[in-house]
Amino acid sequence: THCISSAASDVYKRQHLDTPYPDVTFYNNIPSEWIESLFNLKNTINPIHRKVVPSMYQAILKETICACIRIDGQIIATGLGILDRDYIGIYAIHVKEEYRKHGYARQICTGLLKEGMKKGAQNAYLQVVEGNDNARALYRSLGFQQLYTYWFRVQPDENGNFPPEK
């Protein structure tokens, strides 16, 4: 999997954060409902991921800002901000397929950046999977610039098969 790492220095001083975010709900913790919704948005079916990932989220020691958008009571979009010194890392931006291209990801990103700024963040960073052109366009429009590319290597099992990604 190839990923692109992006960062925006002084993103808050730019004019990219003018999107209102009235649909976004924020939490200072990571609710189990949010994690389950994230699995559903990503179509995560791997039982190992479903078992291990919640404990990984719960083990985050840094201050978090968890965001979601609900329609008819169902979470249709997620985002997570993790604060570290004067940075906020943006993670888990996902929107249910039929709700894409309606500005929900922009609302979540803008909300996380502004809420992070209220808590002392002056810079932001994120990572995006290579080939996710829609996300990359959104992040560029928010002032992010590509810094570098990296990839993960996965060892095949004894039969030469690679584990499923989901």
Residue ranges and their predicted role:
Residues 1-8, 12:
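Single conserved hydrophobic/aromatic residue that forms the stacking wall/gate
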Residues 6, 106, 130-149:
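Conserved active-site alpha-helix within GNAT-family acetyltransferase domains
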Residues 10, 14-52, 166:
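Short amphipathic alpha-helix that is part of the acyltransferase structural core
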Residues 48-96:
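A conserved beta-strand-loop-helix scaffold within acyl/acetyltransferase catalytic domains
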Residues 95, 101-114, 118, 137, ...:
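Conserved acetyl-CoA-binding loop-helix of GNAT-fold acetyltransferases
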Residues 116-127:
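Conserved GNAT acetyl-CoA-binding A-motif
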Residues 126-136, 153-158:
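Conserved beta-strand-loop-alpha-helix junction that forms the acyl-donor binding cleft
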Residues 141-166:
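…primarily DNA-binding HTH/wHTH and HhH modules…
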